Amino acid sequence: MTIIPSFISTSQVQASTTSVAAKALGIDVASYQSADLSAHAKAGSQFAIVKVSEGTSYRNPKGASQIKSAIANDMMPMGYHFATFSSNASLAKKEAQYAISSAKALGLPKGSYLACDYETGQGNIITNGKSVTAKAILAFMDEIKAAGYQPLLYASSSVLQNNINTPSIVKKYPNSLWVAAYAISGRVDKPNFKYFPSMDGV
């Protein structure tokens, strides 16, 4: 799948492709990984989900290079933001706005997927209740949508089932889930497509 950026009058880069074929292979990367994604493209990756931001102050220093490398290697670029808003809808909106500004600054084409990475860590509390948590996540996703990006929600299958009112997410944003769930631990050399999708909304 090829992304061919085009420029419009506002100088905003627009994604020409905004969908991924079924069973396509891809990677997610952060500052821990290389800025050069060519090896992944040669191995068959058709998309790259790049960490753009975290909270309201961290921006991936390799993000621009990783997004640029994805595009140069015909990989569909996407982004994700590590959430720290717990179940606070007001803070979720602020984090979404920071994620949007980071995505734009790093060169993520408008129209691309931009995910909310919701998990424990960095003070993010996931045990405040399913409904209030879902409302905060939806507040984040609504901001992403309004800015011209496509919202996704990344979380483990356990968190999606036990800590979030996930049906309310999927009702508003169908097929918006990016699920972390593994049939086994350790190294897996070939994808097990019989295992995924693991739940509705993937």
Predicted regions mapped to residue ranges:
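Sec-dependent signal peptide cleavage junction
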Residues: T2-A22
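Surface-exposed substrate-engagement region within the catalytic domains
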Residues: A105-L114, G121-V202
